[in-house]
């Protein structure tokens, strides 16, 4: 495995990594914004690079860089979620988020892929890893899926509190948006209720963790339900984890789309396969058995009445 140090993109990414890793904090600031904007622009152009073939040193840099990107993205979303919540109707001001247009394009892309591969409008969607500014759910709910209920899952209670505040003033959105504080690995029975599950790009910060999440979803999602995943391709894999479609055990991969514009994430859509009546051997020699559902209690924010409930995720013009 040869490390292509002569590759100018890899060299530029490593240079930016050194500068980013020296920052005292990753909260929005001029220096943070300039460095991450430069990083995105460096990784955005289509590039045949296969990050899995890079040397160990670059692999370690990539792994750490993805974590730094995730931290910076979370801080940026929290910053703008707080600003938006100061408006009387936050949903009318989502455009102030600097990457809002990217979410408009990504949501349209995902909606088109979803409608091409499914026959019915989903009644209930789960978004795993929704964060303090759940733009995908908000854009899909307001522009494309206007009768669908969205259940947003995040492990961070503060993120859910901020997100729920954004829809509290809107009667329609607050009635269709629910926010659950939970680790997805603890969510079992509830997953059977969703027609579509979205998995955010930064849920599972490396391939191993992401595959564990996918395997968990395969255990508990209903047969025939749809899984939408975000991955990365080429140099964009320095920004987000990569998920190989071959790692989607228990799912039939329907389509994989790699954007070449400013939409960074690749999109994978898959369908949950039926559970075999006779246990089958998986690739590791272990039996794949139908799972027994042990319901857990998960606290959800209901922004309509602000009470806590107990409940068990080619672009067309």
Swiss-Prot record:
Where is it expressed, tissue-wise? Leaves and roots.
- Listed disulfide bonds for this chain? none
Induction statement: Expression independent of the iron status.
Alphabetized GO MF terms: nicotianamine synthase activity
Which keywords appear in this protein's UniProt record, sorted alphabetically?
A: S-adenosyl-L-methionine, Transferase
Gene Ontology terms: biological process: nicotianamine biosynthetic process
First and last residue of the signal peptide = none
Q: Does the keyword S-adenosyl-L-methionine apply?
A: yes
Q: Which residues are listed as membrane-spanning?
A: none
The chemistry this enzyme catalyses reads: 3 S-adenosyl-L-methionine = nicotianamine + 3 S-methyl-5'-thioadenosine + 3 H(+)
> Which Pfam family, giving just one, matches this sequence?
NAS
Judging by the UniProt lineage, the source's domain of life is Eukaryota
Q: Which Gene3D superfamilies match?
A: Vaccinia Virus protein VP39 (3.40.50.150)
> EC number(s) for this protein?
2.5.1.43
Per UniProt, subunit arrangement is:
Homomultimer.
Entry similarity comment? Belongs to the nicotianamine synthase (NAS)-like family.
**What PANTHER family does the entry give?**
NICOTIANAMINE SYNTHASE 3
What function does this protein fulfil?
Synthesizes nicotianamine, a polyamine that serves as a sensor for the physiological iron status within the plant, and/or might be involved in the transport of iron.
The molecule here is called: Nicotianamine synthase
Q: Which organism is it from?
A: Solanum lycopersicum
User: Highest lineage ranks of the organism?
Assistant: Eukaryota, Viridiplantae, Streptophyta, Embryophyta, Tracheophyta
